[in-house]
Amino acid sequence: MRRSPGSYVRIGRVDEVYLFDASSIVNLVRKGIVKPLADGVTLDLALYESLSAVWKEFKLLKRFDEAIALELLDIICDVFNAMKIISAKGLEKEVFDLASEEGLTIYDAAYACAAMRNELTLVTDDQELRKTASKHLTVISSSELASKYRD
């Protein structure tokens, strides 16, 4: 899935270099590290994936009570209000092709394609996505990124 340099479309400010998936967003919020999120971008689908992750931990895994779940939801919504949100609309064929070629879910392929298209570094804590996407683009974990913001 090679692209010619002219096929990339740059979004936002020049200093926006990170595209966050839902796993990295939720993990950074849990750690109380939100500055990198405000400086980055994500896909519109990440909000609902993030909310789903909180719901799963609250309702199914019972890792915390409803008050904590609602607090996390409020913080996540605030974070999304501060982030630049982009859409994967228009990438459907690329997303499907990448998912089919690499065995990714459509959601994971959407993050990878959006990062490739816009020359962004993908931030994910999903090990399978990281392993596969790193063949095509730069990928880091939220912990790696957080350490850059602490220094």
Predicted regions located by residue number:
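Short, polar loop motifs at secondary-structure junctions
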Residues: 23-32, 125-129
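Amphipathic alpha-helical segments within well-ordered protein domains
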Residues: 51-55, 77, 96
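Active-site neighborhoods of divalent-metal-dependent phosphate/nucleic-acid chemistry enzymes
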Residues: 4-7, 83-121, 125-128
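An acidic intrinsically disordered interaction segment
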Residues: 9-25, 78-83
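Internal, well-ordered alpha-helical scaffold/interface segments
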Residues: 23, 48-52, 74
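PIN/NYN-family metal-dependent endoribonuclease catalytic core
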Residues: 29-63, 67-68, 84-87
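Acidic, PIN/NYN-like endoribonuclease modules and their adjacent C-terminal/linker elements
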Residues: 1-17, 43, 49, 117, ...
